Amino acid sequence: MKLTLADRKEEAGDAISFFFLPDAPPAWQAGQFLHYTLPHQNPDQRGIKRWFTIASAPHEGRVQVTTRFTADKGSTFKRALRDLPIGATIEADGPEGDFIITDPDQTYVFIAGGIGITPYRAILLDLAHRGLPIHVALLYGNRNDEFVFKSELEALAKKYTTLKIRYAVSPAKIDEFTIRNLISDLEHPIFCTSG
């Protein structure tokens, strides 16, 4: 499928979101990813293709890619993505992946590290949009206190009392004690990790 860059947004920390309009409505499930192709000059060893989670929920109507950028250390692909002009197109294949919620009545523990929050954003917004229950304990670790999507997550947590969120900033760890403390009242949760 062909994707046209419609907008970009600087997120918390060193993350940027890119918003693409697909040439045809892709049928994806929240949590899935696409395989993106971005030809560019002098590609490094990693080449011109990357996999990124679709950070947007299907109802949002556009494909959102959110990724981190590190000064002068990023791949040539990421630099080409960062410099892509509005209106430019790239190719994508997919969607793929089974990192999806098949039973919204089940209780989940989502563990996110850094930019690994992207599939959880899509999943939580999708559940809310469809009016489905959100029985989730989210543990979100990051190297600093600039958590991507924090305001969106907090807004959801205010609306859904069954969404519990705990943040951990390096050097703090999401360890067994943290997990047990957060899920002490949950019966047989399903654990998902990303990042």
Locations of regions flagged by a protein language model:
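FNR/FR-type flavoprotein reductase catalytic core
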Residues: 61, 66, 73-195
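Ferredoxin-reductase
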Residues: 1-88, 142-144, 154, 170-171
